[in-house]
Amino acid sequence: MAKVRVHELAKELGITSKDAVTKLQELGEFVRSASSTIEAPVVKKLRDAYPGAGAAKAAAPAAAPKAPAASRPAAPAPGPAAPKAPAPAPAAPAPAAPAAAAPAAAAPAAPAPAAPAAPAASTPVSAKPGARPAPKAETPAPARQGGQAPRPGGPRPGNNPFATSQGMPRGRGGDGDRPPRPGNNPFAPSQGMPRGERRNDGERPGGPRPAAGAGGPRPAAGTGGPRPGAPRPGAPRPGAPRPAGGPGAGNRPTPGMMPNRTERPAPGGAGRPGGAGRPGGGPGRPGGAPGAGTGGGAPAGGGFGKGGRGRGGTQGAFGKGGAGRGKQRKSKRAKRQELEQMSAPSLGGVSVPRGDGETIIRLRRGSSITDFAEKIDANPASLVTVLFHLGEMATATQSLDEDTFGLLGAELGYKLQVVSPEDEERELLDQFDINIQDELDAEGDDVLEARAPVVTVMGHVDHGKTRLLDAIRNSNVVAGEHGGITQHIGAYQISHVHEGKARDITFIDTPGHEAFTAMRARGAKVTDIAILVVAADDGVMPQTVEALNHAQAANVPIVVAVNKIDKEGANPDKVKGQLTEYGLVPEEYGGDTMFVEVSARQNLNIDELIDAVLLTADAALDLRANPDKDARGIAIEANLDKGRGAVATVLVQSGTLAVGDTIVAGTAHGRVRAMFDENGEALDVALPSRPVQVLGLSNVPRAGDTFLVTPDERTARQIAEKREAADRNAALAKRRKRISLEDFDQAVAEGKIDTLNLILKGDVSGAVEALEDALLKIDVGDDDVQLRVIHRGVGAITQNDVNLATVDNAIIIGFNVKPAERVAELADREGVDMRFYSVIYAAIDDIEMALKGMLKPEYEEVQLGTAEVREVFRSSKFGNIAGSIVRTGIIRRNSKARVSRDGKVIGDNLTVETLKRFKDDATEVRTDFECGIGLGSFNDINEGDIIETFEMREKPRS
């Protein structure tokens, strides 16, 4: 026995395939889909789960063989019809008349338009209630039986794949609520199911069917067809009062509305209507009704010319009535699909949703086309195609920059906004119910306590910032800086007695070299007060102005320290005058900026400078913070210590940081294992405004990353991972090289673009960041060469760095770090170039020279000599030979040449293929010597022409 599929069994039981699959899964059977096959025991188990459905199904087939058409009427005998008679009470008057007189009875009962049109034959057929009388039921019964046999006229109901699914459902509709029989046209506009249901509802009992059959199987089918049924809601056709007009098919205008189908005309009541030829088919073919009453049905339907056509398009019957239109009419589904396709804009052969030009789409940095597609509910592949037609090439998962998204958004009518890093960080923390700003706003005065001011020392390189801090701290940091310039951010806290009270002050030292712009900006961001150091002998310099702009942008009060007043040529008044141009007016000039003249070398006026800082803090700032909460702050600097691992210098801005707290700083996370102050002494807690070194992080955070204490390690890890993914995507988008379609073929042909790959390793993260920014700003004036930093990190050069450099053919730059001995041997063996620097500008100069060396050589034309043609010799073997005399320079064989005549070039980019002195071959011929010159296939040579030879020489790059 063949295995049964789930959907076949579902049809047999009268349930949906989905219900069957669900039920089987509930019963513990593994079923993947409705097309799965199941064994006999499983079939039995499902049948047992639906005993009622199985019984109903069994009963239906039993009744079907007797009379498919009659089964619908449900009352071939008067007995069954009697109980149903009360339901169609309104139709009772019409059926009371005998079959022959049915037309007369139908006329008064049926609607005005239908009554006159209904013929005698159609009357008994269409009237459901009218068919109920026992005598009528008996009369139609034989007709139906006879009709079943002669059904050769057309395919069985339901077998026609082009039918609109009326045939089969109608034949069985009277049996009970059963799904449409197999064979329904899946492309029909969904009339099949409703029809079957209508026959089963109360308004179309099976009783009337027999009566209808009496008049003729086909008419009965037509009349009893689910389509014209009275229950049809919203159908403004005469078919609505069906009960009364049952006896006469003419009462059913639906058939009349059916479209013309010349292939099956049914004249009079002969073929379909009158003849019992289609009893069973009647139900499935509403069109049969009109045919039954040839003349009657058609006029009732609105008088279409070809009355009696048994079959008509279902939409003509149920939709807008009218003859000859159903054949071309499309289903609602098809129309809807066409409308959607028409409304969807197309670009490059794909349809994508468009905005109205004002729709704002927010994307994170480094988003891909897939992310954008999710926002606008589009197919990523379609957006890739659109971008391709706009001249940009990208994959669906490739991180794109803001310009590319702007181009795509403008084309599709969207305004794309790339979320700023600050907003991105805020949205990320919101996912973990952390909102730092709300925490600060919710704090009242009762929980705030005074904290130390954070002071940043800024200024131009070599103006004495670090020496000034040495004087304040009584230490000697300058001696430890390479090249005498600061390349790190240092943070220290001192205690100073001010007005008889000990006050703590936190100092942050920033680099002054131009490469450390990011560090200076970071220092201004975290500070309360800025000390602007200006050398009295140099005056205002570029980095002085930049530091001033950073401080003013951060809205930070500024105290000016005029340093080196002990030096010859010092002119503090000149400095004051210069700074006045930038909005810093000294108090003695009527302004509000405090100027203090100091000498860091001689320790002059250091206390006065500290007092000025504290006075400014007390007057202009509210320096308070809440120490009784989880710590929040910023990582000022970080490095990888060989013995202690990742070490981060953090500044606590609010709350209290304690040993054992779980923190996350940028992409690093971990538990605080130990804390140290600037002197290397261990601390247990760090209060607001306290800089400390933290041990225990998973990796080295970047300088400037915010840090916060989290409830548990899991939260810290998740925040760090999300930050890392966002940073990686942003870096990929930034690194992406945009190549237009116009340049793509050329780039491929030329081996694309020369790239210098670098791996940067440094001792602290801030220095590595500054070095990377400075290197990426190098411009050699040619887009054919680009610089790419494929990896950067903090700590010594490792074996993994060498392996990466080997694969990507990269150069390793070590900044204040060295490789281990084994790593150096591996690099030598693999041929990896490693460079080591301790001063940043030396690294910048070397990389710039390397980039210039990678540039494609530029060539210039250098003239070798000229020759005048005296005579032309014709040769069948070599072509025309120019007998010439060399006027200037040298004529060389295989050199490039051009021919000029009367000052006009007539042949260019030629080659001197043959060069002879008389009959001997020559390599070169000098001035005032005669020679024979052959230019290959170029034969347009006349006497008096000038042959000029030249070569292309490489032009040195400046």
UniProtKB/Swiss-Prot annotation:
Segments for region (G4): 563-566
Highest taxon of the lineage: Bacteria
Purpose of the protein: One of the essential components for the initiation of protein synthesis. Protects formylmethionyl-tRNA from spontaneous hydrolysis and promotes its binding to the 30S ribosomal subunits. Also involved in the hydrolysis of GTP during the formation of the 70S ribosomal complex.
Principal location class: cytoplasm
Composition bias, Gly residues: 268-325
Biological source species: Paenarthrobacter aurescens (strain TC1)
Gene3D superfamilies in UniProt: 1.10.10.2480, P-loop containing nucleotide triphosphate hydrolases, Translation factors, Translation initiation factor IF- 2, domain 3
Basic residues biased stretches: 326-335
Region of interest called G1, as start-end residue ranges on this chain: 459-466
Binding site for GTP: 459-466, 509-513, 563-566
Source species taxonomy: Bacteria, Bacillati, Actinomycetota, Actinomycetes, Micrococcales
Biased composition (Basic and acidic residues): 195-206
Protein name: Translation initiation factor IF-2
Keywords assigned: Cytoplasm, GTP-binding, Initiation factor, Nucleotide-binding, Protein biosynthesis
Region span, G3: 509-512
GO cellular component, one term: cytosol
An example Gene Ontology molecular-function term: GTPase activity
A Pfam family that the UniProt record links to this protein: GTP_EFTU
Region (Disordered): 67-95, 111-355
